[in-house]
Amino acid sequence: MKKFESYQSLDDYFSRTYNELGVEPYQFCYIYSDFRAFASCINANLEKEQFCESIINPLINSKKTVIIPTFSYTTEGIFSIEKTPTHLGALNSWILSQPSVNRSEHPIFSFAAIGSKSYLVANCGKSSFGKDSIHERLRGKKCCFINIGRPIEYGITLLHNVEQSCGASYRFHKTFKTRVFKENEYIGSGYTAFVRRRDVPSHDFKFNFLKASKMLYDAGIVNQVGEPTALTNVSLYDYDKTREILVRAFLNDPAIFLSKPFIQN
C-alpha cells in the first residue's frame, strides 16, 4: 500500500474508494475495522482523531449514517450508555467521543451511530440479536457492510442474528442482570444474548466463518480493493444479500458457522 503524506490524502483515498466500491445507494454503513496496516502508512504524526475522521468523514459528508460496534461485555453491575467504554478498537472508541453520537442500550453488545439516521440504534429491544435488535432493524434499510483492514473471513456478528432466527441448538438465551443507565437515569435490566452452550465437553462451539465468507465472494456481492491478508482491504457488501446467503447456508448446513461438525438436536 502507498504511503499517505497527509490526512487529506487519506481522506481523498477513502472518498474515492467508497465511491468506486458502490456506496452511493446505501443509507447505512455498518463498519468493521482493524487499522494496523493503514496506521503504518501515515507519514504524518499519528493522531487518532484526525485519522478516524479522515476515514469516516467521506461517508458522513455523503449523507450516510455510520454504525459501529461498541461492545463492552458488561455482564454484571452497571452499564452507562454515555460512560461505559468499549473493549474494541480505535474506531469503536472514537465514535463514542463524537458529540452527535447515539448509542444503543444493550450492556453487552451495544452499537453507536453518527449521521442523519443515527436514531435507528436508540431504544432497541432487549435481545442482542433477535427481536427489535440493531440487526433486525437494519433489514430492508439500504445498509451495507464495510470492512476496513479486517478480512471478512474473521467473521461478522450478523451470523448470530441468523443463528437465533434459524434456531441454532448450540446456543441458548441468557438473561443478564446488568443495570442500564441513560443520562444517569435507570432504564432497565434483563437484557439477553444468544450465547454458546458450555455443556457439551466434546465441542466448544467456537465459530469459523471461512466457508461462509467464501460463499459471499462466490455470490459476487463483495466489492473490494486492497489485500485482506495484508489488512489493507476495503470491502463493501450488501447487508440484506449477505443475510439471505447466510440464512440459506445455515438451513443447508446448521454447523456452517462452527469450527467443527455438530448435529443439531
Regions found by a protein language model. Give the residues of each.
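N-terminal and secondary-structure boundary signal
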Residues: 1-265
